[in-house]
Amino acid sequence: MFKKKLKKYHKTIKAKIQTIVLSLGKKMLDKPTALNAAPINLQMPDSILFLRQDGKIGDYIVSSFAFREIKKNNPNIKIGVVCTNKNSGLFKENLFIDHIHLVKEKSISSYYLTGKKIAKQYEVVIDPTVFVRNRDLVLLRMIAAEYNIGYLKSDYSIYNVNIDNPELHFAEVYQEILKKCGLIDINSNYEIPEDSDSNENISYFLEANRLAHYIAVNFFGASRSRKFTKENIIKYLQYFQDTWPNKQIVLLTYPAVTDLL
């Protein structure tokens, strides 16, 4: 009981400190740069940078059409992506992306150095995330793009183009952003990333285990809120077996959780 109260108290204090730090950072960093303080006259740009350092595979798939559609409208446009080494594999395989710029997760100095390295190389920066951290503001200020396009960022000065509708699906957010960049006739069909080695390994696994009619389950999403406890995993597996007794179950895993599964 005491441990639970202490844990709850620790979370409360941590949340308050984070709020104070973010508030101070916003006051110091959330200012229009010399370029994006100019009047808005955004047409089809010659270079676009996507901020995807927090990108998950699901977000990548539903937004993957954006890179293809930009190149379809202008094959000569330069497309860059800021991401971490953790999710860079998703973007490196995309033929429509010209440059990958890596940042170290949660390292404000890395964000600063990467932003400084690519300063003024992109006309438009696209940030589809809702939550803004101080390191994100540092990155934007160092990049100093003419247009910073954000989603639900009306209370931030550094974003001079904003998508306001909170009801949009993630793919629809990207469609609206592309429209802001002058694109029309947008095809939002997804681009599914493929890896020949992975395809071969999966095919071998399915064949070796004689799997044909099965249920694939991922108990470990990228967010902490989407991770299941051992007890709940057992409950769900029992439910699946009771509900679909003739189905085989395949558990999706990665090294850190394989022993648990």
Residue ranges and their predicted role:
Residues 1-261:
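Catalytic machinery of carbohydrate-active enzymes
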